[in-house]
């Protein structure tokens, strides 16, 4: 912010005098929020985020840039979207990207000042236009050392394996085991992870085997960090979509990103149509 600690302290003191309440208190050499401070911070955080975004847009526009705010599921952004963004930046050097994340539930695009979002689920979003991107191919994947440690060479061996679970996707193992004709195995046992990125790290560390979208782990499979210990896969129940507010559909930066990501998704779908093993 360009302010010294003492200057920040003075600003806080002015705000506390204006509000007539203490926002912070010292506890064992630590400065922590009071109950009033916590409530106040919660109430104004959204407004501050909007102010920050608006400020960045104004600063970017001074240099001739247009800001595109993309909101994505965390693992999709880190494992699929971000590695491809260099090509978008090369095509559109005047568009500055702002990437944020959300977890599974739809939200108000306009109220959150989001230009485009990546959605997994049904082809619907409140007050949003929807373009289909791609489906998932779910595959079993684990580290080579884990497969060796339990002698995992066929789907029947999953009965003695630790099944790594993605918290919001219990259908992944249910559907994969059904496709492998192993429905007698309990599909819901095993440690649970909030994000696929966490589950992938656990699989690479040898904690167990995951039912993972293949497009998220192609690099890990290629470099040998993960393997598919036996044949088999299943198409996921849902699909990834690009969503954006109707009021922003004609914005140049939105049109540019839509064209680009649909092209990238077509390439992914082409790879997915190849016979799986």
Predicted regions and their residues:
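Helix-turn-helix DNA-binding motif, specifically the short coil turn and the N-cap/start of the second
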Residues: 3-7, 11
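A short LG(V/I)-centered, amphipathic sequence patch enriched
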Residues: 16-33, 226
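Short helix-loop hinge/linker segments at domain boundaries
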Residues: 28-31, 38, 49-71, 273
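C-terminal effector-binding regulatory domain of bacterial HTH transcription factors
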Residues: 94, 214-223, 231-277
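Acidic, Gly/Pro-rich loop/turn segments at junctions of secondary structure
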Residues: 100-164, 168-192
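Ligand-binding "clamshell"
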Residues: 125-130, 134, 220-230
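Hydrophobic hinge/microswitch elements
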Residues: 185-228, 235-236
């Amino acid at each position: 912010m360009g302010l010294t600690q003492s200057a920040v302290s003075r600003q806080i003191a002015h705000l506390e005098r204006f509000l007539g309440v203490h926002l912070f208190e010292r506890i064992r050499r630590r400065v922590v929020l009071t109950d009033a401070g916590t409530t106040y911070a919660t109430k104004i955080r959204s407004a501050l985020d909007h102010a920050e975004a608006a400020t960045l847009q104004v600063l970017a526009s001074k240099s001739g840039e247009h800001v595109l705010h993309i909101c994505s599921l965390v693992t999709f952004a880190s494992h699929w979207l971000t590695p491809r963004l260099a090509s978008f930046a090369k095509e559109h050097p005047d568009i500055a990207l702002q990437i944020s994340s959300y977890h599974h539930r739809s939200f108000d695009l306009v109220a959150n000042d989001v230009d485009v979002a990546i959605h997994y689920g049904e082809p619907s979003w409140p007050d949003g236009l929807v373009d289909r991107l791609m489906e998932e191919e779910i595959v079993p994947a684990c580290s080579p050392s884990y497969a060796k440690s339990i002698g995992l060479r066929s789907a029947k061996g999953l009965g003695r394996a630790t099944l790594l679970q993605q918290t919001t996707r219990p259908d992944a193992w249910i559907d994969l085991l059904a496709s492998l004709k192993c429905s007698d195995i309990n599909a819901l046992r095993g440690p649970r992870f909030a994000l696929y990125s966490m589950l992938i790290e656990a699989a690479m560390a040898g904690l167990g085997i995951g039912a993972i979208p293949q497009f998220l782990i192609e690099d890990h499979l290629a470099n040998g960090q993960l393997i598919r210990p036996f044949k088999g896969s299943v198409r996921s129940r849902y699909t990834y979509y690009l969503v954006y507010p109707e009021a922003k559909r004609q914005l140049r930066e939105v049109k540019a990103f839509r064209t680009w990501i649909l092209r990238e998704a077509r390439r992914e779908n082409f790879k997915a149509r190849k016979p799986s093993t």
